[in-house]
């Protein structure tokens, strides 16, 4: 019975890897199923389902500080529900990180995730040229002669953010030298297709994160190819921009303050809110209420959050909330880099660790210009990347050292 449950758990994990790129409801259902089966299996074994890791201390501190913002809320229940709308995912991480997956199944899961992202990329590129969303049966937003790709999601930002993180995994796998040339070329082709889908999304924040992923990966694995691969990326980007002038206009708008007025106004408004509420913040789900009080004069075509995850954390949870959130990710990077250095050169889990490092590095850069952590589609994939890395750290670094 227990062996059958373990097999079912693995299949649900693989299914989760596939559905992550296609459905918010699906990814939540599969995540819930993985958690439920994990608890059932450990109940059969009469074992503790969570394996210790020091990262949990940093995550727990972040949660405690975030909860402190409830002290100033006029409606504690509503604020708590709004907070848990995204941060419930973090509560599953100790269980996900403790999954006893073999390296083989972990790698298969990542391969399925990359394949799923490639299919989502092809669909997004189709949307870019046709403006058709076959899944939701709607017309897409038009920019010049082309359209914003949204994949299977409702937002181009959600689509771009998740494609960005999976691209990092495919790119890391390509950089890993201990595999055949055919396998490496397959990963490179996958990364290239996903790259085109990010371009098709017209998400400028994700565009800005791409060179960070490329350069950081090369600095980590093969500095000799830094100029060659970086130059190839520049040529590819220039080719896309030259042959599709509408994308050139979109790219140049990054540097035009007049075309970023809403974002700049939201940043200034957020700074004013933080100045008056630096310790506890304003609480989750209240940004629009305070926007009406603190808004600086000017044009706004969006609201709801600060259009910057760092500013948004400081607004919602105060400066202590921002500090503990950043500290949590610094701690995660520390444990991942430590694991990457300790694992043998030929260990395939090294490329998974590198992929998760590049993925979260990329999304943290993109988060300087947009709120991705508050988007549940992105939040789940973000924590998926973190949990996979922690899983390897627990299995191969932390617990062996403790024993």
PLM regions and their residue ranges:
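Membrane-embedded alpha-helical segments of multi-pass membrane proteins
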Residues: 25-42, 83-94, 159-167, 207-215, ...
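Alpha-helical transmembrane segments of multi-pass inner-membrane proteins
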Residues: 12, 16-17, 107-144, 151-221, ...
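Transmembrane signal-anchor hairpin modules in multi-pass inner-membrane enzymes, especially those
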Residues: 1-81, 101-107, 111, 176-183, ...
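Transmembrane alpha-helices of multi-pass inner-membrane enzymes
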Residues: 10, 33-39, 172, 354-403
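A conserved mid-to-late transmembrane alpha helix and its immediate loop/hinge
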Residues: 195-197, 271, 277-280, 301-336, ...
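Interfacial transmembrane-helix termini
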Residues: 15-34, 48-53, 64-89, 99-108, ...
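A membrane-periplasm/extracellular boundary helix in multi-pass inner-membrane enzymes
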Residues: 122, 128-129, 218-259, 268-276, ...
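Long extracytoplasmic/lumenal interhelical loops at the membrane interface
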Residues: 257-268, 280-317, 340
């Amino acid at each position: 019975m227990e062996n059958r449950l373990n097999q079912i758990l693995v299949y649900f994990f693989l299914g989760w890897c596939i559905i992550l790129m296609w459905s918010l409801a699906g990814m939540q259902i599969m995540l819930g199923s993985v958690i439920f089966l994990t608890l059932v299996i450990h109940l059969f074994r009469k074992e503790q389902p969570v394996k210790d890791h020091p990262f949990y201390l940093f995550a727990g501190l972040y949660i405690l500080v975030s909860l402190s913002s409830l002290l100033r809320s006029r409606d504690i229940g509503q604020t708590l529900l709004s907070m848990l709308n995204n941060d419930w995912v973090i509560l599953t991480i100790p269980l996900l990180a403790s999954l006893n997956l073999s390296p083989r199944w972990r790698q298969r899961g990542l391969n399925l995730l990359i394949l799923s992202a490639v299919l989502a990329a092809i669909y997004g590129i189709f949307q870019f040229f046709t403006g058709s969303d076959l899944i939701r049966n709607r017309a897409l937003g038009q920019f010049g002669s082309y359209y914003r790709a949204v994949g299977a999601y409702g937002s181009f930002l959600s689509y771009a953010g998740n494609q960005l993180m999976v691209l990092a995994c495919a790119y890391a796998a390509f950089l890993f030298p201990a595999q055949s040339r055919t396998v490496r070329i397959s990963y490179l082709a996958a990364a290239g297709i996903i790259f085109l889908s990010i371009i098709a999304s017209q998400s400028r924040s994700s565009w800005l994160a791409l060179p960070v992923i490329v350069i950081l990966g090369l600095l980590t694995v093969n500095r000799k190819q830094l100029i060659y691969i970086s130059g190839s990326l520049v040529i590819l980007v220039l080719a896309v921009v030259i042959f599709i002038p509408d994308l050139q206009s979109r790219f140049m708008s990054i540097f035009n303050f007049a075309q970023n007025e809403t974002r700049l106004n939201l940043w200034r408004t957020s700074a004013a809110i933080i100045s008056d509420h630096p310790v506890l913040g304003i609480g989750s789900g209240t940004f629009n209420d305070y926007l009406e009080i603190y808004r600086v004069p000017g044009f706004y075509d969006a609201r709801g959050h600060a259009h910057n995850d760092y500013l948004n954390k400081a607004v919602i949870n105060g400066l202590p909330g921002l500090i503990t959130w950043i500290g949590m990710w610094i701690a995660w990077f520390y444990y991942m880099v430590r694991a990457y250095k300790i694992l043998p050169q030929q260990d395939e889990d090294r490329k998974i660790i590198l992929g998760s490092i590049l993925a979260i590095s990329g999304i943290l850069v993109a988060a300087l210009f947009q709120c991705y952590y508050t988007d549940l589609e992105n939040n789940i994939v973000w924590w998926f990347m973190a949990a996979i890395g922690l899983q390897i750290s627990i299995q191969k670094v932390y617990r062996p050292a403790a024993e």
